[in-house]
Amino acid sequence: MYWVYITEDSEAGITIGFSAEMDKTFLKLSARGTPLFYLRSFSIPFDALAHKHLLEDLSLKTIKRFIRTYQAETKRCRDRLLINYDEKQTF
């Protein structure tokens, strides 16, 4: 899977990222205490990168609307990452 995510912190502001290894990226973000506000998965890397570039071209107001609109999907994806992490830790 390929992932597009959005984080926000007081120093860097909003960051729109892409990851092919979201479990590792999620751990790094968690270790730094960086909240994950938006997370969406894609099966094709081109689609993920196109979505990332679309988000980068949008206004901050529209990005915040995306974050609100996809809150439930972001939570499901985040929970799935946590479950996968827990399963890996038990082996």
Regions found by a protein language model. Name each.
Residues 8, 22, 46, 78, ...:
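Intrinsic-disorder/low-complexity regions
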Residues 2-32, 41, 53-57:
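GIY-YIG-like beta-to-alpha core
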Residues 2-5, 38, 70, 85:
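Sequence-level detector for tyrosine residue identity
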Residues 13, 27, 51, 61, ...:
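A generic signature of intrinsically disordered, low-complexity regions enriched in glycine/proline
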Residues 70-91:
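A cross-kingdom feature marking charged/low-complexity
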Residues 30-75:
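Aromatic/basic micro-patches that form nucleic-acid/chromatin recognition or nuclease catalytic surfaces
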